[in-house]
Amino acid sequence: MNVELEKAGRYSFPMGVMDIAVRQDDQRLYAACLDGIYALELPSREAKEEAAKPACLGRHSSFVSGVALLENDLSLASTSYDGSLEIRSLDPASGAAIETRFRDSIHSFWSWRMAVSPDRKKICSVSGQYLAGSEDYAPLPSEEPTVKLIDADKRTTLLELTMLPPVQCVAFDPTGKYLAAGNLMGDLVVWDVASGDVLAQWRTTSFTSWGIIKSHCYISGIFAVSFSRDSQTLYAAGMGEMRDPMAGNGKQLWQRFAWREKPVEKVQESMADQTGEGLMETLAWHPSGDYFVMAGRLRGGAWNTGIFSAEGGQLIGQAKTGMRISSARFSQDGKVLYLAGMQGQPRPKDGHFPDFGYVERYLVSLS
């Protein structure tokens, strides 16, 4: 099986796109951008060349890092580098924000990433600042919880969990019973959502670099986590070790772990001869569960969007977009793949910064 991607639209935003959420009817997309939260009316899938312009719904006081739809697409949650969580009511017809129902500072540092449970009733945000905690520059443990689980309806905190900072990614499993997160140092933790108990905790050294050139500190780590469709294994993504962390030339990398085993076992990883160089920042599963996407920045190689078989881990599809990809999402029917990110930051022209945030839409087919 091979997966083919046919580009069916590119939509620009004033600034870089950090995350996206797509309505179940595939008619509207919401974007978390460096300068705010945007809504984009999506043209029909057949209208490949039709232009669409986003509208700003609101702003945080810093970069917006995460966005997700709640309660039948009638509310929108967003998180930011200012450490805040906001929930906005949406107009069912226009998709515009009616009011901000909730706003709270949930972290004293950045919200790196946010995830919403499959039933859309729970929000999890992860945080943490990298401060040297010892002579070997290992991170200083955080003085506050770095993982927070919040009830999306009652807006109350359900769990406050501790993990070595910075915690850079988070994901629920398909049942909503388990929560996983990854950090700079390659630590991975799986929790029970109901109790907050740690079910598995381990470290992989494959994603973290120590700078011996220019940057004498730890860098990179795990940037995306995702459970398999049966919840039995956990995938982690980022890039391989580098001697010069400023070069960004680590191997494009994912690893798969049987997290229920004692001890946890690495059971699979991306194949070296099928990957290039660059930081991988997002994972997304096709609704069928037959394959997943890993995407991010390209430093060297043939693709920055790779599609991999769930069964054998083989590369079965690819795309080279020319932009850094920060978020990937499939439509509910699996026929469309959305890729979001940014492409450089141009110099101002005539007193105005040209757009440098983008969402690309691809039609998905099998051959």
Ranges and model annotations:
Residues 1-367:
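WD40-repeat beta-propeller superdomains and closely related acidic/aromatic-rich repeat-like regions
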